[in-house]
Amino acid sequence: GGVDIHCHIAGPKVNTARKMRPEEKRHEAVVPRTDRTHSGTLGSVPSTFATGYKYIGMGYTTAFDAAVPPLSARHAHEELEDTPCIDKGFYVLVGNNHYVMKSIADEEPERLSAFLAWLMGAAKGYAPKLVNPGGVEVWKHNQAGNVGSVDDPVDHYGVTPRQIISNVARAANEMGLPHPVHIHANNLGLPGNWE
């Protein structure tokens, strides 16, 4: 069957979306309960049961949620456990993690590798995920802020997105993960972001 290597079916962003659209649960189509299935709701953010049934109905057998914060890993596992029919996992967000950036700034690759190995084991994640590496940290201190390129230094750490990407990729490759690092580069979706 098919493998969806990038979806959003568990974790805080999904639950926030469900809370933002409560009217959908009253008006959207439902998945009826049968002798073999649980009921579920559809809409823009389906219930866990409906998600599993729809994926298997489209021919998918595996799905990976692409963005779970480490502190939300346990709840994401509970949601995925509630999603039937398919194999599933998730990627752990690390691209703006303070400990990651501090380890890189202090030029301690062994400390970074040990931390990532511990974090992946503690969260039981499938791969580390980088989203706008360093850019989110800049935004935290200046709501209109971001990094303009992969070579702009990140406030308070003095590391660049390029250093975050290369160091996390190196550490993940050393771990021998089946999917070493999943990257959403800086300025994704903006013209000229390939530069």
Regions found by a protein language model. Give the residues of each.
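Metal-associated gating/positioning segment near the N- to mid-region
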Residues: 2-80
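Charged, glycine/proline-rich intrinsically disordered loops and linkers
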Residues: 20-42, 102-111, 142-159
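Alpha-helix termination/capping residues and helix-transition junctions
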Residues: 57, 82-85, 122-125
